Amino acid sequence: ITPVHCPGHTPGTTSLFFEVPAMEGTEKEKLLCGIHGGLGEGTLTDSDMAWNDFPRNMRQIYCESIDRVIDMPVDIVLPSHAGHGVAYDFYQLAAQNDGSGRCFVDTGAWKRMLTARKNIVLALSNE
């Protein structure tokens, strides 16, 4: 497991990356799994940052931490919370799983997820 300090909704957020053996029928020998430990932007409103005594540049720190890991070649996104995923429902994917796990492989999901969250935080900065 490779931990990466990624300040997100709190200054101490950590993201984790680890490899798993690829399932039969994939081109790779190993797949990279990634979990971002704190994508929730709810603590980055002006009032919440003041309440939590976060530094005024916490939104910038959040965006910089996303930039550090956005290009990781993640094959399988593991959301830290059900609502912090990408544009699909992980419970629905799990229900459709044929036992192979292939339904969870999405090489573009990591970048889509982080880009969407970063854009939300950038919009907060422009309010």
Name each model-derived stretch:
Residues 1-98, 102-108:
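Metallo-beta-lactamase
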Residues 99-127:
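C-terminal regulatory/interaction regions
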